Curated annotation (Swiss-Prot):
Superkingdom of origin: Bacteria
Residue runs in coiled coils: none
Residues at the site labelled Interaction with tRNA: H133, Q348
EC supergroup of this enzyme: transferase
HAMAP family named among the record's database cross-references: tRNA_thiouridyl_MnmA
Keywords assigned: ATP-binding, Cytoplasm, Disulfide bond, Nucleotide-binding, RNA-binding, Transferase, tRNA processing, tRNA-binding
Protein name: tRNA-specific 2-thiouridylase MnmA
Organism taxonomic ancestry: Bacteria, Pseudomonadati, Pseudomonadota, Gammaproteobacteria, Pseudomonadales
Disulfide bonds: C108-C204
Example GO molecular function: tRNA binding
Ranges for region Interaction with tRNA: 154-156, 316-317
């Protein structure tokens, strides 16, 4: 099977997902320079019902249009808000309701950008899509592999690990071979409106709002006790869903007699008792895990796990590669790490690598403590 990307660029129609940011802007420009037939598409994935625009969608659309006008390409628009609500946001709420800390960007990539957008672009007659993600692809015979982006500070393979190889084969990643300063320099050189635009951070549909204010619109808070590892009650929490493992800020603990000056950290969320367990010190033993379990893993391409396999893994974005052994178990997959892993968080994703190849990953179900808990 020949990858669609290997066709003559002049005969290949590519629709670029235009976010209104500098990365997708430069992606479209580079594809134009490479001779592809390029069009853009701006997708709106969130509908506000209060008349506000926390996602800055209006401003982002204007920026995307300005860039497309500048480089002379057509801009399509599409509304995937219904798909986003059904396939991303409802899952996001269910995870928080269950006491976990989800990452909606990963699900958005799988369900929206590389499914809804890809299908829509193909329906418009596109041969390929392109995005501004900092990843690379490599075609090896019948498979297309997902590789880390060349810029280690911007590599986004962690967020694309749940996208299948067939979808990767339909996608170009023009900025994956570049470093961020190069991308901004290209945008500035060509007078693109997004050249100096700040990178978007945080979750789109929350925007500038306080996370707790947003979440309580959809989920009822269940206040409870804050306890030490010895079971001493030292405060109250407003809801376990507002806290994550390793969190330091916003606990409201202070002025405790004989507690010392070391900061408090979230060590554990006891869902059965609705208790937030905390302890002092950045190196508290309860913060460290030796292994984790994931019930399901999405592989970019099928891999052989008939016996344990030595790989590297990340349990959070921008973490360095961590040596581990991955094996199948009756309950899913178990990754045993060579070194202690700090703040392994159920609901977040563990992503596995073989060198620069992103193999896939899954949602962390549980973490095994590095040392026994009394």
């Amino acid at each position: 099977m020949t990858s669609p990307a290997l066709k003559d660029p002049a005969k290949t129609r590519v629709i670029v997902g235009m976010s209104g940011g500098v990365d997708s802007s430069v992606s479209a420009l580079l594809l134009m320079e490479q001779g592809y037939q390029v069009e853009g598409l701006f997708m709106k994935n969130w509908e506000e019902d209060d008349g506000t625009e926390y996602c800055t969608a209006r401003e982002d659309l204007a920026d995307a249009q300005a860039v497309c006008d500048r480089i002379g390409i057509k801009l399509h628009t599409a509304n995937f808000a219904a798909e986003y609500w059904d396939n991303v946001f409802e899952h996001f709420l269910e995870e928080y309701k269950a006491g976990r800390t989800p990452n909606p960007d990963i699900l958005c990539n799988r369900e929206i950008k590389f499914k809804a957008f890809l299908d829509y672009a193909l329906s418009l007659g596109a041969d390929l899509i392109a995005t501004g993600h900092y990843v690379r692809r490599r075609d090896t015979g019948e498979l297309t592999e997902l590789l880390k982006g060349l810029d280690p500070n911007k590599d986004q393979s962690y967020f694309l690990h749940a996208v299948g190889g067939k979808e990767i084969a339909r996608t170009l990643f023009p900025v994956g071979e570049l470093e961020k300063p190069e991308v901004r320099a290209i945008a500035e050189k060509h007078g693109l409106a997004t050249a100096k635009k700040k990178d978007s951070t945080g979750i789109c549909f929350i925007g500038e709002r306080r996370f707790s204010d947003f979440l309580k619109q959809y989920l009822p808070a269940q206040p409870g006790e804050i306890q030490t590892t010895e079971g001493e009650v030292i405060g109250r929490h407003h809801g376990l869903m507002y806290h994550t493992i390793g969190q330091r800020q916003g606990l409201g603990i202070g002025g405790l007699k004989d507690a010392g000056d070391e900061p408090w950290y979230v060590l554990h969320k006891d869902l059965a008792r609705n208790v937030l367990v905390v302890g002092q010190g950045n190196e508290h033993p309860w913060l460290f895990s030796r292994a984790l379990l994931a019930s399901e893993i999405f592989w970019v391409n099928p891999i052989d796990l008939s016996s344990p396999r030595r790989l590297t893994a990340k349990v959070r974005y921008r973490q360095g590669d961590q040596q581990c052994t991955l094996e199948r178990t009756e309950n899913g997959y178990r990754a045993m790490f060579d070194e202690p892993q700090r703040a392994v968080t159920p609901g977040q994703s563990v992503v596995f690598y073989d060198g620069e190849v992103c193999l896939g990953g899954g949602v962390i179900e549980t973490a095994e403590p590095w040392s026994p808990r009394q």
